[in-house]
Amino acid sequence: MITGIQITKANNEALLNSFWLLDDEKAELRCVCAKSGYAEDQIVPTSELGEIEYREVPLEVQPTVRVEGGQHLNVNVLSRDTLEDAVKNPEKYPQLTIRVSGYAVRFNSLTPEQQRDVITRTFTESL
């Protein structure tokens, strides 16, 4: 089960008043917002934050059904390792082309933020 939390006490002062989504089953936290040191949507093991105290924040999840027409599917046949390696070694993948929003685009032409977003949205395992 996912629980929303606000950190009220921590050894790391940057964590004070930050908001997280806590997944007890996987012992992971997803950052919603923090002063510094953690990016939005960054997932970390709970042990990384050290000794903390927190208060639960109610989460409101309302299922909504919105029909706006057809569906869209981008199919990229490659592995997460390939994309991660392309981020680290772009010179090895000058012709790597992926589908983004219906368009073919060279992976290396994307900004680092866009590359990370593609990897995150394409290969999800939790949260």
UniProtKB/Swiss-Prot annotation:
Modification type Glycine radical: residues: 102
Ranges for domain Glycine radical: 5-127
InterPro entries per UniProt: Auton_GlycylRad_Cofactor, Form_AcTrfase_GR_CS, Gly_radical, Glycyl_radical_cofactor_GrcA
Gene Ontology MF term list: formate C-acetyltransferase activity
Alphabetized Pfam families for the sequence: Gly_radical
Record's function text: Acts as a radical domain for damaged PFL and possibly other radical proteins.
PANTHER family named in the record: FORMATE ACETYLTRANSFERASE, FORMATE ACETYLTRANSFERASE 1
Protein name: Autonomous glycyl radical cofactor
